[in-house]
Amino acid sequence: MTNQRIGALTFVVRDYDEAIEFFTQKLQFDLLEDTPLDEHKRWVLVAPRGSTGTNLLLAKADSPTQELAIGNQTGGRVFLFLHTDDFWRDCNEMKTRGVKFAEEPRTESYGTVAVFFDLY
């Protein structure tokens, strides 16, 4: 079998700069790339600081169908599972930066869980 990995997952956004601000300022992700592709499209990659795994490709919606997916990209399921080496530090810092949480953190058999809202 070949050696494969997921390089990026697409996150459909309303506006590139608004999404970059959310991910880099609120979540403290790194902006890995922001390359214009044409007059309307950019190749924008973000990832958690220190990550060597999968990146998020921020893709601006360019059709009514894509616009309908903004804010509901996973049909109401959790979109992102973000692992950290210090849950409480990161959770408290995110709250300080204005990230809104759906509920208080809770302990599950697989770890501590906190559900937060993205910009949509």
Role assignments for model-derived ranges:
Residues M1-A8, D30-D85, R89-F117:
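Vicinal oxygen chelate
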Residues V13-E18:
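Short acidic-aromatic low-complexity motifs
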Residues A19-T24, M94:
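Conserved active-site tyrosine of GNAT-family acetyltransferases
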Residues Y120:
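Asp-based phosphoryl-transfer active-site loop
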